[in-house]
Amino acid sequence: MVSVLHPMHLVCQSRFLLPAYDGAEVELAGFVWYQGWNDGVNPKTAVPEYEQNLVHLIHDIRKEFGAPKLPVIVGELTGPWVEAPKEWTALRKAQAAVANRPEFKDNVVFVPTHDFVRKAEDSPNPGHGHHEFGNAETYFLVGDALGKAAVQMAGRDRQVREIRGWTLRVDER
C-alpha cells in the first residue's frame, strides 16, 4: 500500500524526518505536482475539470501554508501513452495551461516530460506502462527536470535569507 503524506504533516514532523535540522526553522519553499494518470483514465469527468481542479489545489495549498506566492512546479504526465488518445493530450494541455494563467505568472511553471519516456522494450517491466515500464532512466530524467525547475523557482524573489543565525543579502547586479 502506498500512502501520501499531507505536506503539513511533513513540515510538523521535519525534526523527526530530518534530525540534522532539529531546531532549525522549516520553510516550505515549493510544491511539485506530478500526477494525472487517475484523471486520464476518467476522460468524461476528470479530464474536462482537470485544469480548474489544479488551480483550486494550488490556491488551497498556498492558503493552508500562508504562502500566497509559493512556487509550484507542474510535471507533465508521462507514460507509454505519450502519443495518446485525445483525452491524454487534453489532460497535458490542461497541465500546461495552469502555468500560463496570468494569476500564476512567475510562480507556477510547467515542466515538459514527454521526451523522457523510454520504450517498453528498453525497460525492465514492459507490461507495466502506467509506471513508465519501471525504467530508471525515465524516472531520473523526470526527477532531474523537476528538481532543476524547483531550484530555479526557489531562487526567485529571495533577496534576503536567514540561515542559522546569518542574514544573507543577495545583490544580483
PLM regions: where:
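Cell-envelope and extracellular/periplasmic
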Residues: 1-173
